[in-house]
From Swiss-Prot:
NCBIfam families: arch_S11P (TIGR03628), PRK09607.1 (NF007176). It holds the Pfam family Ribosomal_S11. GO terms for cellular component: ribonucleoprotein complex; ribosome. Keywords: Ribonucleoprotein, Ribosomal protein, RNA-binding, rRNA-binding. Located on the platform of the 30S subunit. Belongs to the universal ribosomal protein uS11 family. GO terms for molecular function: rRNA binding; structural constituent of ribosome. Part of the 30S ribosomal subunit. This is Small ribosomal subunit protein uS11. PANTHER family: 40S RIBOSOMAL PROTEIN S14/30S RIBOSOMAL PROTEIN S11. One of its GO terms (biological process) is translation. It comes from the Archaea.
Amino acid sequence: MVFSAREIKWGVAHIYSSYNNTIIHITDLTGAETVARTSGGMVVKADREKPSPYAAMLAASRAAQQAMDRGIMALHIKVRAPGGHGPKTPGPGAQAAIRALARAGFIIGRIEDVTPLPHDTTRRPGGRRGRRV
């Protein structure tokens, strides 16, 4: 299929990937209008499977189908980890979600990491002597 640049409808895929879950949220370019929203917990039964790459892949393909039904043909991708004083690296589902969106037939524009990084952080929980286990 050949499209002119004017005909292609772009969207933004916000992928939040932690070590507990993966959330895929597809919006229009402004980010104001939600097109599709799914998570790893919506597609698997067991809680322990929520953060898995397989759950992220299923969630991404479900979100991709909903977005294509709404006419979106191309995506910019924003990947986010918990950040702040949590982990600064995305969880195991981020890579699988990006790959599933690409396989679904979208044109992929920019892939960007939007993890919030503190410039001078708030104090970590646990106190002066740390968490005593």
